[in-house]
From Swiss-Prot:
Enzyme class: oxidoreductase
Keyword check for Disulfide bond: no
Annotated Zn(2+) 1 binding sites: C66, H95, E96, E193
Gene: iolM
Designated name of the protein: Scyllo-inosose 3-dehydrogenase
GO biological process: inositol metabolic process
Cofactors required: Zn(2+)
One family name in Pfam for this protein: ADH_zinc_N
Protein purpose: Catalyzes the NAD(+)-dependent oxidation of scyllo-inosose (2-keto-myo-inositol) to 3-dehydro-scyllo-inosose (diketo-inositol), and thus probably functions in a myo-inositol degradation pathway together with IolG, IolN and IolO. Has no activity on myo-inositol, D-chiro-inositol and 1-keto-D-chiro-inositol.
PROSITE patterns the UniProt entry points to: ADH_ZINC
Keywords assigned: Metal-binding, NAD, Oxidoreductase, Zinc
Binding site for NAD(+): I223, E243, R248
Assembly description: Homodimer.
Amino acid sequence: MRAVRLHAKWDPRPEFKLGPKDIEGKLTWLGSKVWRYPEVRVEEVPEPRIEKPTEIIIKVKACGICGSDVHMAQTDEEGYILYPGLTGFPVTLGHEFSGVVVEAGPEAINRRTNKRFEIGEPVCAEEMLWCGHCRPCAEGFPNHCENLNELGFNVDGAFAEYVKVDAKYAWSLRELEGVYEGDRLFLAGSLVEPTSVAYNAVIVRGGGIRPGDNVVILGGGPIGLAAVAILKHAGASKVILSEPSEVRRNLAKELGADHVIDPTKENFVEAVLDYTNGLGAKLFLEATGVPQLVWPQIEEVIWRARGINATVAIVARADAKIPLTGEVFQVRRAQIVGSQGHSGHGTFPRVISLMASGMDMTKIISKTVSMEEIPEYIKRLQTDKSLVKVTMLNE
């Protein structure tokens, strides 16, 4: 079968030390410290086969390009990949996907029915392949699994004709049938994963909101835009998005944003205070990936606003120092939380239900492409911000 594969050279930086979970020449939890000169290309690879009774084979229908895919293929001036996390190459990329079950092991249980997965069942899947038995998993934190693997990062992913996953990571999309027809069902299904990342950030880690609260989202990428839709559906009074791209600001309005800010032309602090009548926001989402640039403005809003007890949730991956002023968070009773992943807490089924109830995330898909075009668009998305989500659509 055909698949989009990433190859890179294992060439650790001088200061890198092999960690306890790293495997020399194969796998690291610090990708940007090790992998150099990435190449992305379409190749022929063997079709996956069921090896455990709990596994399913999925015929991939749709798979979106994530910023992580872009950063695994993008390099700094020394040729090292930008993505800082868990990676093991070569690997088939792709983790924002949906498809249909074409084979199911005898113990592959569908959590929607508590019965074996049906052949032809439309599904999506988590990319965080948690073990379920380490201490973080046992305490209910699968996104921080000590034995974590990740689909499309160190386990072969879904920019392919077929992908194999354990049934415990798969979620039925039957609820979307009748709401989305034809390819749109699978396009919507491919957006469950990134939308769940946003849900985990603003609802699970950020603590959610009370209806009537104000929220501010910095960064109008897919995660930021998903947060706009989720928080508006959760009852936010004023959803404010800050984003330089006009295309993305307009999409935010379509998804429910009450106000949008162009930070290159407007004073972010004054705009937020004006839109909220001086109260500020209960929740801020940092989704820009450049926290060192936006943090001073977030702090100033928190300091000057009449409202207290704000939460700042950091969701964008960035190996950057934040210029934090502790006094601001002490006096204004504010807090910072980090957010990683999308697993646990019933996040996937809740996102699917939101989509079934009318939260249409397919609006963010700028273009559908073939598998052969994926390497080109992974490269193009390094610089082209007019495209929000590019999604592979298989026949």
